[in-house]
Amino acid sequence: MKKVFSVMVALMMALSMIAAERGKLIHVDCSTSKNLKPQLAFCQETKDGQDVTTLLVKTVNVNQYNEFNDASRVLVRFADGAAVRLNKVPGSAVEKKKHTEKKGNATISFYDTYTSYEVSPEVIEKLETGIAIIKVRIVFKENDSKDYDIVEGYQAKMAEDLLKSYQEAVLKNRKVNGDTADDDF
């Protein structure tokens, strides 16, 4: 039993390190409690000679892990009225991590999930042209979704931080592939 627990702890630590290595997570600033706000970051890797960009989404729940299936998706509404659908990366695992915080005499457990979604070039183009994200909907599975209205004063900052996350992901991917680009000099 102790060995199984040790393996599980090691697996959880590895998953959280993987998520941390993927990029800095950007808070979705909305009216939700600070601990329950989703966080986003871009990741990029090369598959079959193609650079593939994904959006890593971290969600938090206090009762249990959020559950995802193949119908999971993220809908992003931009300030120009456009809405973009990001589908869950087929076959990608949902990474999970539990942590606790003490609040007075109570200990609260938080259940984090990390899920990857496909990113269309349109999302990057809108961020590059300074178009802010005003709303995010995470569809965990059919009939189970949550909307996040982005606080107006934070919209531009969030778009800027996400663009920076994308640029950092591109540079990391270049370095992993041995590209000694001068972009980060």
Protein language model features and the residues they cover:
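An ectodomain-focused feature that recognizes extracytoplasmic/extracellular
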Residues: 20-74
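Bacterial Sec-dependent N-terminal signal peptides
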Residues: 1-23
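Beta-strand elements of well-folded, non-transmembrane domains
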Residues: 59-63, 78-82, 142
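Beta-strand signatures of extracellular beta-sandwich domains
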Residues: 75-77, 137
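Short small/polar-residue motifs
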Residues: 34-44, 71, 79-83, 99-103, ...
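Generic marker of residues within folded, mature protein domains
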Residues: 9, 47, 64-66, 76, ...
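Internal interaction segment
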Residues: 82, 86, 91-185
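Generic cytosolic/nucleocytoplasmic N-terminal low-complexity/intrinsically disordered segments
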Residues: 1-2, 36, 57, 171
